[in-house]
Amino acid sequence: MPLAFTNPGTPLKRTAAYDNVQWNQNRILTFGTRYTVLIIVNNYESYQNIQFGESIGAVALDQRTGFLAIAHGQVLDIYKPADSLKWTHHYNYITQLSEDITQLSWGYNFDLLLCASSYTKLINFSEDKPRLVWSQNRISDSFLSSTISSDACFIASIETKNPLAKVWQRTSPQGTVSSCDDFSYLVHPCRVRFSQWSKHLHPDASGSTPFLSTVGYDNVLRIWQVGSRFGSQLMHLSCFLNLRKYYKSDQPPYCCFIDKDDFTIALAHAISRHSGQVHKDRILNRLLALASGQPHIFLLFTFECLYIFSLVIDQETLSSFELINQVPTNFPKGALQPDGFIPIYRTSKHEFYDYNIILFFQNSAREYMFSLTDFFYSDFELRVSYDFYGHDYPIKSLTRTSNGHGIVSRDVNRICMFQSYISQDGKNQLICRFRLLLGESDFILPLYAGEYAAVLNLNSLKLWHCNEAIPPTLLCTCRQVPTSPIITFFILPVQNNDNSALCALTEGGHAWFWSVSNEAHDGSAVLRFIDRVNFTKNLNIASAVDVMGWSSTLNLSSLSSFDQEVFQSISKDGLLQTWMARVLGDDKAEISEISKVQTSIKSATMIKGSTSKKVAVVSENNRRLSIFDTRSSEFSEKEEFSSVFDDYGPINDLDWTSTPNSHSILAVGFLHDVILLCQNRRSYMNDIPCWSRIRRYNLLEYTNSLISDSSWLDNGTLVTAIGNGLFYFDNSLPEDQSLLFPASLKRSAKNIFDLAYQLNGILPVFHPQLLQQLLLRNQPFLFTNILLRFYLCLKDDVDMHFLLNMDCSEFYCCDEEISKDLLIKSLSQNSAEILNPAELDFEETSVSKHLGLYIDEMIKKLTALLKVKKVKTLTRSSQFLLLNLIEAFNKARALRDSLDLNGKRYCIMLNQYVLSKHQRQLTSLPTREMAWAFHSSNKAVLLDHTKKLHGKPLLWNAVEEYAIPFWLNEQLLKDVFLELSRNHYAEIDDRNPENVSLYHIALHKINVFRDLWRLASWHKESARTVKLLSNDFSKKKWKVVASKNAFALLSKHRYFYASAFFLLADSCYDAAKVCIRNLKSISLAIAMTRVYEGDDGPTLKRLINEYVLPLAVSQNDRWLTNWSFTILKQEKKALQSLVSPIRSLVSDNDFIQLYTSDKNDQEIHENKDSQRNSTNEPVRNKFPSDDPAFILLYECLRSSNVQIDESLEYRFVLHNANVYCQLGCDLIALGLLRNWKFQKNPATAHLETEDYMVTDKQSAVEKTHDSPKLGKTLMGQDIRPTPDDVPEFNESAFSFE
């Protein structure tokens, strides 16, 4: 997304504020606006904008060194070039005089000539302290200009009313000391308008003797050469040209010189562009003949014709002008009279045209281009290449048109400028349509395509007709306006070509509505007040939803069916609300609350919402940005992103845009940077953030001004207001370090819209995330069929369509027999590709008879191919996960006859966990996988499979890692404890019984434990412990002794042993508390309690109520909550925990608050550490707790005995379909919606669709009857149809590893 173009402001209409040089093989152009200086290198190859606090007086570039001198007021600043063609500040010089510097001119060895009205000075800046070389004060008239020649030997000055131009000669201009004692007068018959030294391409080369050109008020061009032919003058009049002969006006002429060397190079470039034979081209031959005499070219423009003269400077003979040609031209009529020679410079060799000239107009300066060959065509055409215009004062705000085709910018001096976006000659730029002077408290809103503007203040609402051909015209005024301060002013989202509705929000929580009617289409319009509505009493700030995206995400029928968010507000205490606003009639409007979120953000300073129902909120200190999903329901978290931006300074701007595929991108503006945030596809397989920073603009590369506002155009161009200029960044992606994510530069995404689709779009069916969901949904035959097609495409290097040419109906087919038949059919058609019949040891080769064999062989070949061949459209990480998933599936197939559905799910997810835990740095099996095993009836098989995957003797760390205490039944858990006691005892050489104490005592094997201590005779505690364990601990006396020993062990930090002695004292709860508080293992507490007391014991229930449930609530862990209620035999709550807010199911809020506060304190501590180490990662970078597997478990557990509210189940299904879409599995979402079977059909009243049910990718429901015919525009823009084809998915170079 590089810089496309800029509007720097209106250039100063003085040639002294403009300069260009050819330096270091680069063409450098610089000019000043009122408060800024622009530096443009090689036609915007590099661009820089430097802002000052005072008006710019003059600029000058040193052709030898590239140094830039800038005069503003009585201050002179010098900038030096850096390696990256940027200029850095080098020196600051104050003249100590009251007059402003009006002209600058560089000499040799950092000599700089300063000119003001009463003096001219030559100062040397080669040393640390400036040194005055020479100065001259005015005698009579003020200095008009003072310039130094290209060889630095002569200084020429002209005065305002003096017909004498004065020339000083410098002695030893290249030395450290020089004087200008020798001078001469150049006599003119009238006052001199302007003068110019010849600018040579190589000023220090031999033969580049300078000459001086002057134009007097008699419009005669005079050429003055060095030396005297008739006396002792320093210069003499070599020749002259009477311009009045060609230019019939007393006004200053439009003329310029082209240096002879520069002309030769430009001609060489013109010849290099010629595709045919040069000697056959008549025009090129004429130019070659002209260049052979090494002339300077003089161009004289009139409004009808261009005159081309040649001037040969010769020291031996008299010089003369020769008219080469005159050609009709289209010289612009509105160009202002020049105060010097027209600025002209050669273009780079890669451009089609040879030269550019700059002409000044009333509110702009335009760059025109032409070719040398145009000199001899029948018509000379000046083509506009750039229009320099803009604000003279810093821009305060930007307001976008509703269709995104233009913006209105407003500066601090209340000048408002409307600019519309156009594409001309392959270049994109904004054209200024009108300017309007506003009041101090006015709000402006462009209407339709920008040809109308509404201006609102506390006195009136005015409607202006704004056309670029005529000045803005006031059409009508409405006096019914708010009396309290206005917060925001916006247009309602639905309008047609003739009517629109306006809305203003005030600090009192009121909304004012007006209508604008333009049915006559004759430039007239009617403005009418509609209604005032009170929508809230607790209002801090409010803003309209960013309209970029309405045209691509909604159509009019959807707006008639659903309530669309129009604006959002937030209170002082952090209550975020979104509102729908609409006009019901001629005098009636309505505002309804759509959603509300209680945030923890107090006194927010900024909010901005998108059409995809995302709202960005900035904290009170302008450092923290949070993004909320207002569409989120009770099933998910609402805060998706929160990050502190300390490195970039305070946040001062937010702006949303929507891609053609309805993905949101947020531009966050800081002092000198703009960060683009894009939402990520939810990931089931990688820990990636919900939102990622995909692009950073460091505006310090271009300017030292501060960012004031930014706005998106509809084509993805980001317009940023900085100082008095506008910067336009197109939607392309540069291959540089400014691309923050993905980090790889080699990618298929060409612009930010493509990148947003890669991060959010539909996944191909062979992506491991989609395949994993198919397995979880028990669609193994469809899974295998996809693998087969994928294998055939990969083997033959066939381009892979994202559906692999499969029928969509296969994905929502709920009959596994049909899926099996389709798989058999595909295998039969490609059986020779998979299995050679000659290799079989049986005669029957039917696929249906040996389906397992064919599948095994296909998987074997696909796995081998994936290990050696790169899949073009997958990342290395995704390809690894695909291999992982295939291997997990293959292992689960071996157990398919021994497992139920949940057992298969556990095996698949366990295999994936084991294969990827080191890469993902996982330390424990997620509670989701624990739930699959817990609800399986084949726990013995699962335990055996887990041990095999672990591949080592089972120790406690492994038991805790795989959450075995939670999902094994009581008897199997006792067997595991017995195995742990053996393995831990044999683990170390000394065989210390203390290491297995808890296991034996939990198993009530005190005698075995005593025998182990008897064998440990080497231990100093052996005898005493054996004696102690020989007592009867069923008696109260010995329970007290065991308890005292437990406390003694606690004081010595021997926690494991202490827990065993609490258990020996029959204090199971105390033993569990030691495990939780001291050993930090709630798993050990649960396991020990279940083994010691059984699942029906009181301690387990107490632990669940006091520790497990509060922990689950604090972490929003529905899986753990479901497990807890199932153990507690509360079946209804267990089922509700999958669909209802967890807090509503837990009554003991004291423990919840305890865990929540502890968690928040820990997060704050971790966040501070992470910010101290790196500020490049968001504070909250995990996905919300939405998981489509909830509905899979819900489907397994629901029964006729436990009834769930029908409307709640309905919303739950829709929510999970939305989550599937966010995972990129839209086809699975469709299958869920098509195949879901309600136990009882929901009532019609419960089928009303709510906003949060609508997904980004859900098609709008078209009304088939009783629907009025609506227009085809939205926000004044034609509604675009849904794309016919989906962009190809390619994540091949994303750095997701």
UniProtKB/Swiss-Prot annotation:
Residues 1161-1171, 1260-1269 have a biased composition (Basic and acidic residues). The keyword DNA repair does not apply. Its main location: cytoplasm. GO terms for cellular component: cytoplasm; cytosol; endosome membrane; nucleus; RAVE complex. Residues 1161-1182, 1260-1297 are annotated as: Disordered. GO terms for molecular function: protein-containing complex binding. Keywords: Cytoplasm, Membrane, Nucleus. It is found in: Cytoplasm; Nucleus; Endomembrane system. It holds the Pfam family Rav1p_C. Disruption phenotype: Leads to sensitivity to a range of drugs including doxorubicin, camptothecin, cycloheximide, and bleomycine, hydroxyurea, and fluconazole. The keyword Mitochondrion does not apply. GO terms for biological process: late endosome to vacuole transport; vacuolar acidification; vacuolar proton-transporting V-type ATPase complex assembly. Component of the RAVE complex which is required for stable assembly of the vacuolar ATPase complex V-ATPase. Component of the RAVE complex composed of rav1, rav2 and skp1. Interacts with vam2. This is Regulator of V-ATPase in vacuolar membrane protein 1. It comes from Schizosaccharomyces pombe (strain 972 / ATCC 24843) (Fission yeast).
